[in-house]
Curated annotation (Swiss-Prot):
Keywords, comma-separated and alphabetical: Cytoplasm, Initiation factor, Protein biosynthesis, Repeat, WD repeat
Family note: Belongs to the eIF-3 subunit I family.
Principal place of residence: cytoplasm
WD repeat positions: 8-47, 50-89, 145-184, 188-227, 285-326
UniProt superkingdom: Eukaryota
Protein name, per record: Eukaryotic translation initiation factor 3 subunit I
Keyword Hydrolase: no
Subcellular localization: Cytoplasm
Lineage: Eukaryota, Metazoa, Ecdysozoa, Arthropoda, Hexapoda
Signal peptide extent: none
Function: Component of the eukaryotic translation initiation factor 3 (eIF-3) complex, which is involved in protein synthesis of a specialized repertoire of mRNAs and, together with other initiation factors, stimulates binding of mRNA and methionyl-tRNAi to the 40S ribosome. The eIF-3 complex specifically targets and initiates translation of a subset of mRNAs involved in cell proliferation.
Entry-linked InterPro entries: eIF3i (IPR027525), WD40/YVTN_repeat-like_dom_sf (IPR015943), WD40_repeat_CS (IPR019775), WD40_repeat_dom_sf (IPR036322), WD40_rpt (IPR001680)
Amino acid sequence: MRPLMLQGHERSITQIKYNREGDLLFSCSKDQKPNVWYSLNGERLGTYDGHQGAVWCLDVDWESRKLITGAGDMTTKIWDVEYGTVIASIPTKSSVRTSNFSFSGNQAAYSTDKAMGQSCELFLIDVRNADSSLSEQEPTLRIPMTESKITSMLWGPLDETIITGHDNGNIAIWDIRKGQKVVDSGTDHSAGINDMQLSKDGTMFVTASKDTTAKLFDSESLMCLKTYKTERPVNSAAISPIMDHVVLGGGQDAMEVTTTSTKAGKFDSRFFHLIYEEEFARLKGHFGPINSLAFHPDGKSYASGGEDGFVRVQTFDSTYFENIFE
């Protein structure tokens, strides 16, 4: 089946995310304007206009009422999903690299970059009664990162912990009540982590790393369960909600991309079996590295956002579901 090509960004995509029902697909890019799309037919429903810099991250809450974005203009913004208005704008001292709502939607976490003389910090805010006064309020928790900066983040079960992936390949779990690290993965990855995504039940998560591998980890112990090997840096990885499949996307850094790379299959979405660690399919499409991947919550399609500024939504054929691994 032909993929839907969503063209609404002028610069490279930084992150894409479905809401819980899967009817909305959110995308953000370096062109300052996050978009929301109707995932079934690729219609653009709206644009969230307000940032003055590249938008690095976004997340939508459980009820699809609020959207949080973090950008290079040194702000985190919380938006009304339906009306596209800014509920709150929180100033920071450096670029915001990650932002996530907790599962309950009561809290949000975001992290800042190690830049401009500022160290990387992890912040927690209460967003239950979010309004414009949030910009003056102190965060409920603030954890400075003494070692490597945070490049990706997930909420742990029951909103009690936060899992962070770092620029040196380290993964850590933080207890948000005590404000301290409780588990450290050590050196499973030898280079920076670009992306982390949970499985549907939250017991596992997959990482995508610059060390050319993606790995499956246990969410509580941070034990490395599986490794998916490729030949080039992995920018994003996602776990299928219905099949034992993992999809990986990446390519070289944007600086190193040459015109021959598309033919060489360097920008394909690559499908691996979750348990057997074997690659079984590739899908072409992007004219540059894939920066973000997301499975639809029903598992029947997936979306990819690339350095070329396109978001592609690919629906699986029936043969995909009949393919039993032997």
